[in-house]
Amino acid sequence: MNPLLDKLQAYPFERLAALKAGATPPANLAHIALSIGEPKHAPPAFVLDTLRASLAGLGSYPATAGSPELRSTIARWLERRFALGDGLVRDGGVPASMVLPVNGTREALFAFAQAVVDPTDRGAPPLVVMPNPFYQAYFAAALSAGCEPVLLPATAESGYLPNLEAIAPDVLKRAIAFYIA
């Protein structure tokens, strides 16, 4: 096993579940779960209709990159949502080839660190900068890619934003990624 795994801390949602085990919310108040972002509502009817219409395709794996139609639709949505005019990303807008659908944020965040680290570079370990508190996937991805995590405090005093001016030049020089929460 990779010895760097020993540096990982307990997953926050497991720790939170243990801390609140046995706690009973007051009977006169509605319980609001603010832990893991699990859906609490039924899917909209149009989603269920689309899923039912697609059941025949569940017997095979989809293309890793998703369908061209899906990637194109996501690219157009990005352009509308973030007002990305033609030429901002590339002439003609966001190319669908720059879009990669994933099953969840952890998968993509983890894979990103693996993709940007050159394992043949034997200099000082690269750094991955992240706010603290942080999403556990940032830390695990950095360690698994052979990088050193650099934690930037995001406290009430800083408006819960990391102070980017406080990042030392030598850290910036070695940083290969910066996760922003």
Task: State the predicted function of each range.
Residues M1-A56, L172:
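Conserved N-terminal helix/loop that builds the PLP phosphate-binding region
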Residues G59-A181:
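Conserved core of the PLP fold type I
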